[in-house]
């Protein structure tokens, strides 16, 4: 674990809510803030530099940072929060927000942070019972990321922002016809709850789990989706089960897109700089395929939240205000957590944004007009959508259970959560 120092204020934008935001730290009591986040190296390094800058400006504040990949992050944080040992500040995904807020594990953040330059709808995603408990860090859009270099060399029709699911599957078939035997076109999404969510939303059938906690996986649509991937697996368009099982999203070595096993995968705009950093200029972002409706949506990339058990709520709040509103911080962080939430900060950054950054900005612009309404998800269902669904899907991939039997298991498992 690394220990850094931290602090508050650089070139800041907006109007202060309280005078304490720019106070000198001279004579103030030393504070060490535990802070934790997930991501790749392209997020870790700028974040550590930002913490160093904060401490330089506020010498009384130092940091005890922890950072990791996404795998295992949520489980570890949940365990810490349950034992009242959560970090003072932690990165939180929207899918878990309602659970943390309903368990009174988050400190209220309604004052001390300048929010006037942030879209009201985006701020609403961090509210619970009309109170602000989490601060969005980036505008984000669902996406597909593909290897543009390889697709161009294959000479096939590339993905587009207006493509349908039929065109997506045909893209996979066309690509596989020109790929080597040990290379595949599409990732097998049989066990991917998020990918299926896009598919069902695009059919106009709503989210697989409703906001009020009801099972809503349409049987006909789900079997259509699962059987499509079974056919693609048989044709070698998606990898065999044993290769699919090795995939770890965002991992530099095990992500099947990174290691050139597949050409395309579901992703998020906020993740794109991580892909681009490993292979600059190779990847391209496009919208999720559509059905009768769009399949994609806009969402906050992630939140900063403060533990309800922190002894340093005021300093944690000051840091978050600085993180989202300070121009010097923005110069370091750029789009490592998605397109900046502050409209003022985004305009400040525009002249220095690189191609990978601008792809995120353009993706958000393209997704917005027909975006599906994003569902926070019902509280208490994260284990079902993150683990149970994945486990059942993997049994289908390995041929241990038929799609029809798998659907029955999904229904049975859901009764434990309804």
Regions found by a protein language model. Give the residues of each.
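Extracytoplasmic/periplasmic solute-binding protein
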Residues: 133-137, 142, 167-221, 262
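Mature extracytoplasmic/periplasmic domains
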Residues: 106, 273, 302, 306-383
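Extracytoplasmic/periplasmic substrate-recognition and gating elements
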Residues: 56, 64, 154, 237, ...
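Extracytoplasmic "Venus flytrap"/periplasmic binding protein-like
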Residues: 52-120, 153-155, 254-264, 341-343, ...
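Glycine-centered hinge/linker elements that transmit conformational signals in sensory
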Residues: 214-246
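C-terminal capping/gating helix-and-loop segments adjacent to ligand/active sites or protein-protein/ligand interfaces
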Residues: 359-414, 418
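Short, low-complexity disordered leader/linker segments with a strong preference
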Residues: 1-33, 56, 408, 412-418
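Hinge/lid segment of periplasmic solute-binding proteins
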Residues: 93-143, 284-286, 353, 365
